[in-house]
């Protein structure tokens, strides 16, 4: 299949996931919001020159979207799941900070290798996937009635999303500047 067909298959899979979730929690506003997002994406994929990068980014976002739906269902049916998820995020952040940046003065020396490693190991796509997952959880938590754990989770997820977005822009700007 060509790239356009692959992208349309990804969007169809995401739409199916949204329909199942909407039927499950009986909230059909999400389907309308997702159809609007699909319409905006469709404007990009109807062009003649679809590149591999757009396809990879959309695929990573789609994987994150489906992961977000699964985690959202876990949060609804088990509030302890949220605490476990936050604990895992905190441990991962500590591990990454401890391994990559053991001392603050080494950050600039490590940055070149860090960016190269991200590009080679599809780390950028991983960031996009995580961003899609967090965005999905964020939107679904806003739909829930205001509970204490939802408000705290929304604040934490918003912060993580801002950090990931800043990192993606830094990586893209850095590699664009380096190779241009």
Curated annotation (Swiss-Prot):
Membrane topology: Multi-pass membrane protein
Top-level lineage group: Archaea
Keywords: Cell membrane, Membrane, Transmembrane, Transmembrane helix
GO CC annotation: plasma membrane
TM region positions: 4-24, 25-45, 57-77, 81-101, 124-144, 156-176
Keyword Electron transport: no
Keyword Transmembrane: yes
Places the protein is found: Cell membrane
Residue ranges of coiled coil: none
UniProt protein name: Uncharacterized protein MJ0271
């Amino acid at each position: 299949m060509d790239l356009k067909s692959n992208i349309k298959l990804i969007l169809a899979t995401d739409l199916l996931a949204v329909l199942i979730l909407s039927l499950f929690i009986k909230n059909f506003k999400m389907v309308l919001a997702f159809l609007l997002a699909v319409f905006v994406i469709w404007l990009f994929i109807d062009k003649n020159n679809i590149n591999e990068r757009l396809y990879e980014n959309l695929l990573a976002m789609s994987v994150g979207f489906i992961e977000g739906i699964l985690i959202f269902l876990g949060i609804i049916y088990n509030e302890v799941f949220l605490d476990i998820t936050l604990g895992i995020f905190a441990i991962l952040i500590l591990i990454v900070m401890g391994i990559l940046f053991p001392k603050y003065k080494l950050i600039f020396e490590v940055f070149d290798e860090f960016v190269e490693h991200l590009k080679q190991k599809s780390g950028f796509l991983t960031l996009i996937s995580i961003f899609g997952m967090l965005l999905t959880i964020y939107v679904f938590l806003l739909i829930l009635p205001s509970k204490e754990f939802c408000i705290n989770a929304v604040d934490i997820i918003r912060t993580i999303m801002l950090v990931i977005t800043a990192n993606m822009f830094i990586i893209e700007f850095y590699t664009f500047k380096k190779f241009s």
